Amino acid sequence: MTRYLVRPGSRLAGRFPVPGDKSISHRAVILGALAEGVTEVEGLLEGADVLATIAAFRSMGVQMEGPDKGHLRIHGAGLQGLRAPVVPLDCGNSGTAMRLLAGVLAGQPFPSTLVGDASLQKRPMGRILNPLRAMGAEIAAQDGRAPLHIHGRPLHGIDYALPVASAQVKSAVLLAGLYADGQTCVTEPAPTRDHSERMLQGFGQPVERHGPRACLRGGGRLCGQALQVPGDISSAAFFLLGATIAPGSDLTLEGVGINPTRTGIIEILTRMGARIDLTALREVGGEPVADIRVRYAPLQGIAIPPRLVPLAIDEFPALFIAAACAKGQTVITGAEELRVKESDRIAVMAGGLRALGATVEERVDGAIISGSALLGGRVDSHGDHRIAMAFAMAALVAQGDMEILDCANVATSFPSFPALAQQAGLLLEVASA
């Protein structure tokens, strides 16, 4: 078992980029594989999740060179060029890979099976099964969970209203729509990341967007592109947290994607009193990008507006720590989606904070966190990469050393986290049990 041993009392400083965006990296691989011609990707995240997506398409006959230092060359097979895999496609720990691949595979003229690790096989897949089946897909899954046994069939377009805001479900339906007769539309109840819509248009697939509604027509074609993946704001979030809570910190993160559907972490921390400045604003690969400077600032507890929850859904482990370090109470509501992530993030974060001496009232859709001094001690991340990184940053202000258990899955999204954290000043040691 991989453990993090972290000593308190340091600060974060320096200037460096964070790795490529995981969500965009997945989509670059998928659309590059389905496009005609060559797609060149720079800045690709080489984490285990994205590597699982690459391996899946290689199993379906797509030729790729790399990845090597963030560069991947994809020789696209075209929308109709995938070949039947001879083995199950292993998505590892990646819900994004499984849900988006299900959308692609639903319309293929061959059977396929999607599997994952023990954590992924506990996550709900009914949310993609329902719309894909409504489009004509034949998918077998026990209790709405992986493994997914998909028998490709001709699909027809649907007009689908998402019951829960989910970019993964939206993307799965739109990808299936590429293979469907007629128009496929998705309406979301709250804004979610729009990387799929942006990238589909970049690859030549028209997407009509009207407020919460996105529509496309099947029967088109995608054309290979040259793509630059911006830095991942979800990875940057841990450094935004650390520099905000550790006195004397002054840190600049270069080339971070600031897509407005992903910047909830910045808005929430700013509402709490964080000193965050965006500089060198520019556009990279159709996505807004900036350098982010963050300095220490005392935080004040707030009631987080529910409308911001989908815009920061992956960053809540960091926000739980920020709340514990703030003066007063922070109230989180409308965040029940956190219970079906890589772990039950509400329960695991609440339990971890209590182990460090914090006062947390857990609720079905969130929590009330009272700011207090954090003790040292042992915290179990339950194999959740984002929880492991959040508690590593909490150690900056703990009153004693911290040991964080079960950290190996950090490699799924941020394999260079320990090295970058050490470079920035975190007194972190990686150990094996």
From Swiss-Prot:
It catalyses: 3-phosphoshikimate + phosphoenolpyruvate = 5-O-(1-carboxyvinyl)-3-phosphoshikimate + phosphate. Phosphoenolpyruvate binds at K22, G95, R123, Q168, R345, R386. It is found in: Cytoplasm. InterPro entries: Enolpyruvate_Tfrase_dom, Enolpyruvate_Tfrase_sf, EPSP_synthase, EPSP_synthase_CS, RNA3'P_cycl/enolpyr_Trfase_a/b. The active site is at D314. The gene is aroA. Pathway: Metabolic intermediate biosynthesis; chorismate biosynthesis; chorismate from D-erythrose 4-phosphate and phosphoenolpyruvate: step 6/7. Catalyzes the transfer of the enolpyruvyl moiety of phosphoenolpyruvate (PEP) to the 5-hydroxyl of shikimate-3-phosphate (S3P) to produce enolpyruvyl shikimate-3-phosphate and inorganic phosphate. Monomer. PROSITE patterns: EPSP_SYNTHASE_1 (PS00104), EPSP_SYNTHASE_2 (PS00885). Gene3D superfamilies: Enolpyruvate transferase domain. Its EC number is 2.5.1.19. PANTHER family: AROM/DEHYDROQUINATE SYNTHASE (PTHR21090), PENTAFUNCTIONAL AROM POLYPEPTIDE (PTHR21090:SF5). The keyword Transferase applies. It comes from Acidithiobacillus ferrooxidans (strain ATCC 23270 / DSM 14882 / CIP 104768 / NCIMB 8455). This is 3-phosphoshikimate 1-carboxyvinyltransferase. GO terms for biological process: amino acid biosynthetic process; aromatic amino acid family biosynthetic process; chorismate biosynthetic process. GO terms for cellular component: cytoplasm. 3-phosphoshikimate binds at K22, S23, R27, S166, Q168, D314, K341.
